[in-house]
Amino acid sequence: MKLFVPALLSLGALGLCLAAPRKNVRWCTISQPEWFKCRRWQWRMKKLGAPSITCVRRAFALECIRAIAEKKADAVTLDGGMVFEAGRDPYKLRPVAAEIYGTKESPQTHYYAVAVVKKGSNFQLDQLQGRKSCHTGLGRSAGWIIPMGILRPYLSWTESLEPLQGAVAKFFSASCVPCIDRQAYPNLCQLCKGEGENQCACSSREPYFGYSGAFKCLQDGAGDVAFVKETTVFENLPEKADRDQYELLCLNNSRAPVDAFKECHLAQVPSHAVVARSVDGKEDLIWKLLSKAQEKFGKNKSRSFQLFGSPPGQRDLLFKDSALGFLRIPSKVDSALYLGSRYLTTLKNLRETAEEVKARYTRVVWCAVGPEEQKKCQQWSQQSGQNVTCATASTTDDCIVLVLKGEADALNLDGGYIYTAGKCGLVPVLAENRKSSKHSSLDCVLRPTEGYLAVAVVKKANEGLTWNSLKDKKSCHTAVDRTAGWNIPMGLIVNQTGSCAFDEFFSQSCAPGADPKSRLCALCAGDDQGLDKCVPNSKEKYYGYTGAFRCLAEDVGDVAFVKNDTVWENTNGESTADWAKNLNREDFRLLCLDGTRKPVTEAQSCHLAVAPNHAVVSRSDRAAHVKQVLLHQQALFGKNGKNCPDKFCLFKSETKNLLFNDNTECLAKLGGRPTYEEYLGTEYVTAIANLKKCSTSPLLEACAFLTR
């Protein structure tokens, strides 16, 4: 980070010694009024002795994005559409702070995109063709991306023949779309009011630019409809009698009063956000600056300078006037995760051909964790005729993120990860079902899931080892945050010891996903070359059920936390792997919570807990389609599928338990549409919630922000 010597405040200060260097944030502005406000902010912050700010001037938002990427500026506030652009190559900026709207009692990090019309104008949303339109600016959320995404079916747009702007120019009789190329699309600048070169400008030099500008375009009678945000009418017309002259167009082709925006809007849009570089981005310094600024100059804090206010005749300089403050965005959240899958889908719909959009909706993108799962997924994709395609990530958390972004649709998860995915807004779709002795006559797909037994396994020869003497022993875990391998045993241990120091109970462990430098990774081996040690995927030799049991079988650890089936699947000749083919079931014992030990045949009376079955999760808007496709896929490639084993088997792996557990008989339907809490059960959810009090994860922190 660069240090600088602040300029002396006045000539009278020349006799003073130079001040100590202070860290500086270079704020990017896109107009003369913004630059003047920034300079006033700069002066106020100097008086506080807080983080210093200097003001950088550029012509429009994209130039600010470039300046930040090139380290010629550090921060700027952007609308969601520009947050998306900023996050793309080559800029790779990320949002670091979100504006907060609403009220102090009910703060929100989103706003509503609305279509405003004058009362008495006789048309609905599906009758906009041939009308005159007012937009905040090209590429902006409420003014362009959302309405064009909704109007796309009416645009007669042939993607291969012309850009979207050309279709919009033909759809409306005239428009004002600031930031557009007025030479290429004169019709989209026809209503704009700027003079000369300023007509259609991407700043307040165009009077109809931005939210208030687009509404003024409607007020002045230039346009028939203004695409703005829900607060625009209230900010420009404080009197109810004046507001009553306007209405909102609703998606169901009705109209509503302007104060009914929660029921009548085009979309819910993420807040404007401050963006910075994702590497060397001065995030902490920017947040320190914003925190101090909102503390001193936020709503109703100061008469001399208002951070969320603009001079008469101006609106939304630097920040939206309607903002109440800022909320820091967790480091795990990039631009795509911040905007969310629905917003990103709208963007994709405007960038892809109709055929591409249809193909994206038809297929299911499965997320594979690690290279071995990716290999199996690609085989599945090929055999499915591309009805299933593959995305891949190195960790389960990263796969969950891909589903949240809409870059993948589904994956199969252990109960611990179902908890995380549920906290992030994903829903269970289908559950793994094993053979049942209780309901053997029922169709597997319709049979209730019974859960599985989480157990602690030790060598029979290690005679003195019981549940009560595990302290300072060596442990083998499937992975951090997984049910049988982590959540259940560590939850029990935390309850017994009252300590959250996970890495102090056992002398050494292999818990893939833990800090590689900690004791919890000391026993992990990585791949055949010793690389990727302790990663939570199949590159780590001791990852997963089979890996944790192997860690015990090879005398690396004293105890393995797995499921009951794991012992049976890897002993008495059930596995052909070199390390397992000579293992005898009788050589292992289960640890019971009462301090006794029992043979592995007695798991029903000697286990740590009954765990919920693994289940497929997806976004709620894709759940029904994912379910339909998977049921068809298992009819082809399931245990009794017509193409298994000849072509491909979903529930069979070259190693163990790739994509699905190998002992899965079928993917079963769930009764109704259960939430993740209903699927996991209150007892299990409570246990994990208590465990998470010890240590949360970056993904859970991110999702707590995204779902607030």
From Swiss-Prot:
Pfam family, one: Transferrin
Binding-site list for hydrogencarbonate 1: 136, 140, 142-143
Coiled-coil parts of chain: none
Entry-linked SMART domains: TR_FER
An example Gene Ontology CC term for this record: recycling endosome
Binding site for hydrogencarbonate 2: 478, 482, 484-485
Signal peptide range: 1-19
Activity modulation notes: Inhibited by PMSF and Pefabloc.
InterPro entries per record: Lactotransferrin, Transferrin, Transferrin-like_dom, Transferrin_Fe_BS
Post-translational modification: Poly-N-acetyllactosaminic carbohydrate moiety seems to be needed for TLR4 activation.
Thermal activity characteristics from the UniProt entry: Optimum temperature is 25 degrees Celsius.
Stated name of the protein: Lactotransferrin
Lineage: Eukaryota, Metazoa, Chordata, Craniata, Vertebrata
